[in-house]
Amino acid sequence: MNYDSVYKSNKLRSFPYSRRRGIISLKERIIELNRSGKRGVIAEYKRRSPSGLKVDYSIEDYLSYVMEHRIAGLSILTEPSFFNGSFQDVVVAHRYNIPILVKDFVPDSEFVDYGFNAGGDAVLVILDFLDYESIKRIVERAADLGMDVLEEFHNQDALKRQYIRDNVMIGYNRRDLTNLLMDEKIPDFSGEVRILESGISIDNVKNLDLKFQGYLIGTSILKKDGTLEYLEMEGII
């Protein structure tokens, strides 16, 4: 996967204004759950991924499943070339009263507006790929719109470029960007709301490290492997 080409392509994308409601803060939703002793799960929808995942059901079918469970928010892949995503999926999910994270390779602050227009409440920024000033501009534009930002890192060195503001969450994605394998060691990092991403499934959820405020879970929920049901049964969410 050529990440540079994805970022260049994303600079050419746009999306017209189609919001039908105000912002719902994903960060505040997770904090509220934490206050009641729960963790926040962000359920992710994607049609395919470079790691080999392919799903054959629609965003509507996915939403009808996850909205029956106690999730904190939705993460929707909108990148078209490698994930077969679309801003239109955000428009569809926007009818539900739940925070939506627009997950994409956000190249600049202008792209934040497109996520907002589609109905997103938060955007993803990958610290590994952007310089500090670009990250700052994205976070500030999101703040202007009332949106949250999930600053994601894969390599711990990328944390040097994090930009902290009151609308920021910090996420560690366990998937190595070079070989797409999972890192079993989870680094220590600070933040008001910390999110663990990738690799959570029914096979390991019983050993879930509960020191995080939230968890972004994709493939296992898409496969309906019982992870959500287990987390509810144990009172974690």
Swiss-Prot record:
Q: In which pathway does it act?
A: Amino-acid biosynthesis; L-tryptophan biosynthesis; L-tryptophan from chorismate: step 4/5
* Record organism: Thermoplasma volcanium (strain ATCC 51530 / DSM 4299 / JCM 9571 / NBRC 15438 / GSS1)
What family does the entry list? Belongs to the TrpC family.
Per the record, the domain of life is Archaea
| Matching SUPFAM superfamilies | Ribulose-phoshate binding barrel
- Identification of the protein by name: Indole-3-glycerol phosphate synthase
- The record's EC number reads 4.1.1.48
Q: Does the keyword Ion transport apply?
A: no
Instruction: Give the matching NCBIfam families.
Output: PRK00278.2-1
